[in-house]
């Protein structure tokens, strides 16, 4: 068993060996290395053909038309292109956007930028289980609302939003619906024929593809228009200029095809491991799951261990590659804004760990993780005066702490 054990699949996934092998055929002189936009010779034609196949594979994953797939550098760019692209194109119709407080920074910071440009953004508060109630979304809608951006699966707590209901509501009001599917594409079935979603952001490295590649689904019927954010040679039907990275696109396509074929078996195995992990640690006193346990993606478990400081717990769990918060924000010592939005206090938010399980996680690794977590919590609580006070029956909320 290789240490540390990788339990941070929500941050990134290793490239599946089958994907890596396929990608390697599109890089060197011996392979298909041409520019897909070179129309005058075979090197270009072969590369273009490979891109076309990959485009269809990504489209198949969400039951879309291949012409609705735009390749980008990842979900961050897809989110920027979708949100800014809609805002700038439809700004004559209205300048109001709705999103939620628990979105990824790539959505929140894009909305903040639009606020600086004169747009108005409503940030919806989730329930304690992490899910946005439909009536709250409907109440926020106005005549000048042009876009709703709600993620499919949350990156920190793994809860699943009812995107079918959100899509129905948006369509009935004539509002464009963008869904960040970085954490759900390849893990949950997505069908754009039944779900009324207009724009979907997809990430390669969250589904065993390479980093630096993603896609944006842009609905054709009814047609969604975007203002390009990257200008140049007019690639990707004018929506995203830049030479197409054939090897990465092929990798994304192959990853999508594998994810589609193996989704059901992968999910069943991963859910079993996730439940084994939770059943192995839930007996630890003052341990709580964050987010809804029923509407949750199979590989995700976000747990708060009360009276244990998150950073010291991370250090104690050095044999486990886990995170507190998401990789994009865990570099700062701020408590997770997602958990704060759920109503957790700073202490509980600080004592949370995100475990995310994936395709290559084994039962042996989960057994080792349970043992490590149990021992570490016991050891840290032995050293904690707060734990001692709690065990003595002192209500810590009533304690008058002296200020120095």
Curated annotation (Swiss-Prot):
Source organism, top-level taxon: Bacteria
InterPro entries linked to this entry: Aminotrans_V_dom, Aminotrans_V_PyrdxlP_BS, Cys_deSase_IscS, Cysteine_dSase, PyrdxlP-dep_Trfase, PyrdxlP-dep_Trfase_major, PyrdxlP-dep_Trfase_small
EC number assigned by the record: 2.8.1.7
Functional pathway: Cofactor biosynthesis; iron-sulfur cluster biosynthesis
One Pfam short name: Aminotran_5
Catalysed reactions, semicolon-separated: (sulfur carrier)-H + L-cysteine = (sulfur carrier)-SH + L-alanine
Compartment list: Cytoplasm
Gene Ontology molecular functions: 2 iron, 2 sulfur cluster binding; cysteine desulfurase activity; metal ion binding; pyridoxal phosphate binding
Enzyme class at the top of the EC tree: transferase
Parts of the chain that traverse the membrane: none
Residues at which pyridoxal 5'-phosphate binds: 75-76, 155, 183, 203-205, 243
Record keyword Cytoplasm present: yes
Listed GO biological process terms: [2Fe-2S] cluster assembly
Family, as annotated: Belongs to the class-V pyridoxal-phosphate-dependent aminotransferase family. NifS/IscS subfamily.
Subunit-level organization: Homodimer. Forms a heterotetramer with IscU, interacts with other sulfur acceptors.
Protein name: Cysteine desulfurase IscS
Protein species of origin: Shewanella sp. (strain ANA-3)
Gene that encodes the chain: iscS
